[in-house]
Amino acid sequence: MKAYFLAVVLLTLLLPTAFAQTTSPYYHKITNLQQQKGWNGYALLSPSWSICSSCSPTGSTVNWSRTPGISSPSVSGSSTRHHIGGTRPFSDILWNNHIIGNFSSQGIYDTSHTLVPNLHHFVYDVYFFAKNIGASQALEFDINQFTGGKSFIWGHECRIAGGHEWDTYDNVHKKWVSTGIPCNPVNNAWNHLIIEVARTSGNQLLFKTITLNGDTHNLSITRSPNSTSWHAVTINYQEDGNQTQAGYSIWLDRLNFTYW
C-alpha cells in the first residue's frame, strides 16, 4: 500500500499540467486551426513595424499569401502554406486569429465575461515546414489574452537569419528579450513546436516552456502586463523578412490550441 501511495504522489508531481487539464471545467482544445476560418494577414513595414493599412497582398513593397488545403508537404493531409516576399528589407507579415471574445472565429464571444477571466493556462502546439528556412529573419508564435483591462502578450520569436535564438516579448517596454536558448529548426523537414504559458493568480505573465523537436527548455520568466480595453483570447503567427526581403514559404500543420 505504501508503494502504491508513493507512486500516486510521484505521478501527481510529474504530471501537474495533465491533472489541471482534466479537472478544469474550462479545459478546451481546438485542433487543426491551420484549416479553419478567421485568419487575417497584416503587413508590418520596417523600421516602425506598425500595421500598414495601404499595403496589398499583391503589392511590390511587401506581399503575402495564405493557402490552406495543401496535401504535400503535410502531416495531417491538409497543411497551410504561408508566403512572404517583396522589396522592403526586414518587413513582416502577421497572421492573427481571434479564438474567444471580440470577433471570435469559433463563435465563442463570451459577452457575459464568464470565460476569458477564468482562463490561466495556454498551449500553442504546431508543426512547421520550410524548404529554405535560412531566408527567414525570424518566425513568431504568440498567445494573447485581454481581460480585466490588462493585455497579456506571450510573444515567442525564433530568430533564424537573426541569430538562431529564442526571444520573448516584454509587454511593458515593447521589446524583445533574448533567452539564450538556441533555435535551430530543420530545413526540408517537419519541426514540432510546443509553447506553454500561464497567467498567474497575481495577473503576471509566466513564460513556462518551449519545446522544439522534443527538446524542452524551462523558461520560468515572469513579466507584467500592459493595459487594454479588449476582451479576448487570440493567437498570432508571423513571418519576418530578411535584409533583402527574400521570398520564402512556411507550411503549418496540426496547429492545436489548448486553454483552461
Regions found by a protein language model. Give the residues of each.
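Short, aromatic/His-centered strand-loop micro-motif at the edge of beta-sheets
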Residues: 168-194
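Secretory/extracellular carbohydrate-interaction modules
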Residues: 76-78, 82-166
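Positively charged n-region of N-terminal signal peptides that target proteins for export
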Residues: 1-4
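Short tryptophan-centered beta-strand motifs in secreted/extracellular beta-sheet-rich domains
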Residues: 126, 189-199, 208-210
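Extracellular glycan-recognition surfaces and repeat-rich motifs
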Residues: 40-90
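Extracellular beta-strand elements of beta-rich domains used
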Residues: 193, 250-257
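Flexible glycan-contacting loops in extracellular carbohydrate-active proteins
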Residues: 219-253
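Sec/Tat signal peptide C-region and signal peptidase I cleavage site
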Residues: 15-20
